[in-house]
Amino acid sequence: MAATDVRPKITLACQECKHRNYITRKNRRNTPDRLELRKYCPNCRTHREHRETR
C-alpha cells in the first residue's frame, strides 16, 4: 500500500556534500518531478540546493 501512496516520504540531500539532511512528504500528483529546495545544510553551514533522493 505504501507504493501507491499519494504523499510518500522523501529525503532531501545537499548537492554539495551529499548529506541527507531533511525528510518531508510531497504530493506526487502536483509535483511528479524531483523536488529541489534551497535549505540550510548543517554540514556546509550555509544555505544550499537540496534535491530529492530515492
Curated annotation (Swiss-Prot):
Which top-level group of life is the source organism from?
Bacteria
InterPro entries per UniProt: Ribosomal_bL33, Ribosomal_bL33_CS, Ribosomal_bL33_sf, Ribosomal_zn-bd
The Gene Ontology biological process annotation of the record reads: translation
| Segments passing through the bilayer | none
Q: Which PROSITE patterns match?
A: RIBOSOMAL_L33
User: GO cellular-component terms in the record?
Assistant: cytoplasm; ribonucleoprotein complex; ribosome
GO MF terms held by the record: structural constituent of ribosome
Instruction: Tell me which Pfam families the record gives.
Output: Ribosomal_L33 (PF00471)
- UniProt keyword annotations, A-Z: Ribonucleoprotein, Ribosomal protein
NCBIfam families linked to this entry? PRK00504.1, PRK00595.1, rpmG_bact
UniProt record similarity statement: Belongs to the bacterial ribosomal protein bL33 family.
Protein name listed in UniProt: Large ribosomal subunit protein bL33
